[in-house]
């Protein structure tokens, strides 16, 4: 239980939110020093209205990326001026999920014309549990993740591959 929350934050009862926190475990419970909500975009197909009329190819730098507890987690560096208006999403292609057991994901980032002056961090946690088969819920799934990054050429794409096993905590 939380014994002391120094953040002044409120999360409504009976709600669920993915957060990053700095805390200390104490005998009477956790003492929370900082708390930040994470972006948790649910993967959607490229023809979803959320991606309409925008390319979403604005670059990011991946600081760290890892699988954990049915999520693909990442820390990103963005170059920003105001940092306002940035939109993130995950474009999925699961056309090979049934045949090869793989899902392709592309990070959608629309900076909304924000100029690139300063570095700012973004924390994203992509839910993956929806890819687990109901008949074989622990079968592994290959996640192919791509994103646009900074480079001399426009449209520089980097990629990662992960073997996701639903329910695995590591």
What role is predicted for each listed range?
Residues 24-49, 160-162:
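OB-fold/S1-family single-stranded nucleic acid-binding modules
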Residues 42-75:
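Extracytoplasmic beta-rich ectodomain segments of secreted or membrane-anchored proteins
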Residues 63-115:
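Short helix-loop boundary/capping segments
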Residues 12-13, 131-138:
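Surface-exposed, short loops/turns at beta-strand junctions within beta-sandwich domains
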Residues 117-129:
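Aromatic sugar-binding surface patches on proteins
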Residues 5-21:
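Short nucleic-acid-contacting surface segments enriched for D/E, G, S/T with interspersed K/R
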Residues 138-170:
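Surface-exposed edge beta-strand/loop patches
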